[in-house]
């Protein structure tokens, strides 16, 4: 039976029914393995028990991650991408927008839990930590919240928001934080480093950065 030939017939003049899905995406099955090995489903279960919401935040978070890897786009477009997965979304678009507030509020908790669970996949090279900052522009004309006018990497005349990130010695992300676009990036280090020390348990490491984030004030913080 395994060696038996199978013949498939195609009709070149056959018309497809309008609205019938003919494309299915299966690429998400590869990152799905790591999603569950990092126990993100259990993290989502803790959030569900805390907030008592009705929608499936595990399905939402996992689909957003898969879509971000496969085809980065807006949340609305990511929902459309997820609708083409072999496993259909069990939620609606408005549930995604509701879940974003929870994911934003619990961002630090999610990061620390993922870091702890990442040790189940292998040893982390966290004796050396690299820190750097970047920023992202928004196609808006007026400042809004932390989206402020600042010096953007792409030199666009749009409000930006900045991100600082720690990576381990292997270049794997460890923790990140977002801060206003008009803030001095050097001030972003101390709060995030405090979280790494307290929530991540990284109490002894070598700090590495470029010259812009290696000021005398930062050196004093790391040698205190």
Give residue spans per PLM region.
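Dynamic "connector" segments at or just before major functional cores
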Residues: 1-146, 157, 164-177, 182
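Phosphate/diphosphate-binding loops
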Residues: 194, 202-224
């Amino acid at each position: 039976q395994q060696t038996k030939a199978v013949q498939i017939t195609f009709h070149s003049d056959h018309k497809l029914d309008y609205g019938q899905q003919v494309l299915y995406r299966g690429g998400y099955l590869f990152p799905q393995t790591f999603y569950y090995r990092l126990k993100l489903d259990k993290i989502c279960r803790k959030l569900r028990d805390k907030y008592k919401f009705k929608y499936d935040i595990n399905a939402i978070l996992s689909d957003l991650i898969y879509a971000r890897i496969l085809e980065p786009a807006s949340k609305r477009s990511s929902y459309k991408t997820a609708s083409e997965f072999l496993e259909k979304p069990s939620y609606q678009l408005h549930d995604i927008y509701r879940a974003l507030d929870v994911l934003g509020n619990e961002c630090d908790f999610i990061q620390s839990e993922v870091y702890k669970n990442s040790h189940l996949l292998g040893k982390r090279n966290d004796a050396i930590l690299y820190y750097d900052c970047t920023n992202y522009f928004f196609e808006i004309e007026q400042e809004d919240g932390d989206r402020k006018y600042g010096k953007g990497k792409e030199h666009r005349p749009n409000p930006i928001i900045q991100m600082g990130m720690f990576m381990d010695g292997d270049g794997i992300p460890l923790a990140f934080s977002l801060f206003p676009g008009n803030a001095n990036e050097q001030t972003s280090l101390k709060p995030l480093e405090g979280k790494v020390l307290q929530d991540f348990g990284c109490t002894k490491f070598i700090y590495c950065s470029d010259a812009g984030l290696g000021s005398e004030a930062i050196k004093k913080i790391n040698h205190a």
